[in-house]
């Protein structure tokens, strides 16, 4: 792959120059914790924390729990990047985690989340997720372009 490769040019376009990092948030969670809450609360837990799109994605996997845990961690990380935590200003479903064209995790904010983003002078939330069979981690960054 050379520096002139069109796929590199396309990738570079997703990293705009002049973007400013405003804040970050991180969260780590044990997959077993998410699984235990799900086993106790089932649909109530899913509806309270995850959008339907997130549920559909996670339950399309042979083991949905690492994927649910990663999204749980992502929501916590996003709320921490906003310096609000989960609560009145930012709810569990204020953001939805989905995949972009290169399967990169992306954040979709609801109107409440968009208003909070704008009020903080940010234009975008970027995230990264990772998980093993036992642990999930997410980092969120508020940026202004």
What does each model-identified segment do?
Residues 2-145:
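Core catalytic alpha/beta fold that binds nucleotide/phospho-ligands
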């Amino acid at each position: 792959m050379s520096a002139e490769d069109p796929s590199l040019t396309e990738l570079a376009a997703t990293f705009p120059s002049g973007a400013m990092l405003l804040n970050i948030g991180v969260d780590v969670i044990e997959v077993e914790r998410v699984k235990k809450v799900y086993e106790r609360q089932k649909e109530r837990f899913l509806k309270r924390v995850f959008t339907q799109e997130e549920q559909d994605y996670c339950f399309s996997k042979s083991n949905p729990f690492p994927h649910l845990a990663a999204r749980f961690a992502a929501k916590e990380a996003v709320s921490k990047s906003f310096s609000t935590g989960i609560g009145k200003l930012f709810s569990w479903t204020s953001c939805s985690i989905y995949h972009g064209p290169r399967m990169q995790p992306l954040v979709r904010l609801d109107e409440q989340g968009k208003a909070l983003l704008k009020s903080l002078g940010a234009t975008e939330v970027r995230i990264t997720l990772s998980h093993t069979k036992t642990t999930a981690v997410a980092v969120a960054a508020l940026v202004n372009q």
